Curated annotation (Swiss-Prot):
Keywords: 4Fe-4S, Electron transport, Iron, Iron-sulfur, Membrane, Metal-binding, Oxidoreductase, Photosynthesis, Photosystem I, Repeat, Thylakoid, Transport. It is an enzyme of class 1 (oxidoreductase). PANTHER family: PHOTOSYSTEM I IRON-SULFUR CENTER (PTHR24960:SF79), PHOTOSYSTEM I IRON-SULFUR CENTER-RELATED (PTHR24960). This is Photosystem I iron-sulfur center. SUPFAM superfamilies: 4Fe-4S ferredoxins. It catalyses: reduced [plastocyanin] + hnu + oxidized [2Fe-2S]-[ferredoxin] = oxidized [plastocyanin] + reduced [2Fe-2S]-[ferredoxin]. Residues 2-31, 37-68 form the 4Fe-4S ferredoxin-type domain.
Amino acid sequence: MSHAVKIYDTCIGCTQCVRACPLDVLEMVPWDGCKAGQIASSPRTEDCVGCKRCETACPTDFLSIRVYLGDETSRSMGLSY
């Protein structure tokens, strides 16, 4: 089952989520929207196993990264009833 990884604009560019991911799903890319000048990106979501270690590692109170497991992804997109 595939999962979706969403990075929100509350990301502070700290790299904690990237370092926490055991499968190298995440990477940092340039972004001018924060002081660090970079934001997390999830180019390899097909490799995500849904462990949510990235969520746990995120230091922001806004939880700047969310992993939506397969069922959650379908519901949030209105694909299941």
